[in-house]
Amino acid sequence: MKLVIQRVSQAHVNVEGTTVGAIRTGLVVLVGISKSDTIKDADYLADKVLGLRIFPDNEGKMNRNVAEAHGAILIISQFTLYGDCRRGRRPSFDAAAAPGEALTLYNYFVDTVRKSPVPVETGTFQATMEVSLVNQGPVTIVIESEERNRK
């Protein structure tokens, strides 16, 4: 799994002109799922998202996680994170999981994050979405679950 995490002051996602998810202070998490991903990958990344200390403390140092910052999380599926542009000009998405397989793991990831006290909003899986956000900092972090095996 691959996540792009952005610290935001506000964000919302629309599908066909209707807002389906919105947050104020918090994290926007774009989620890409590959063919080889498992529940272990989702567990690892859910823990990372919830524990990531990228919010400022009283001294301005990045020392608080999203719960400590009284923030929320907006999770959005994005298979294009597995776009491979090494050959030609059109990305190949061969590494991305098939929609049914990806939906199961995406829902598991969302449900795992929702077990925390942090409010969670989502986009709509496999929909064309309009995502608007105000990146605070800016702070943008990319985390891949395969990193857990590199320790």
From Swiss-Prot:
Transmembrane segments: none
Motif window: Gly-cisPro motif, important for rejection of L-amino acids: 137-138
Any Pfam family hit: Tyr_Deacylase
Residue stretches in coiled coil: none
Keyword set includes Hydrolase: yes
Main location class: cytoplasm
Keyword vocabulary terms for this entry: Cytoplasm, Hydrolase, RNA-binding, tRNA-binding
HAMAP family: Deacylase_Dtd
Assigned protein family: Belongs to the DTD family.
Subunit relationships: Homodimer.
Protein name in UniProt: D-aminoacyl-tRNA deacylase
The species this protein was found in: Solibacter usitatus (strain Ellin6076)
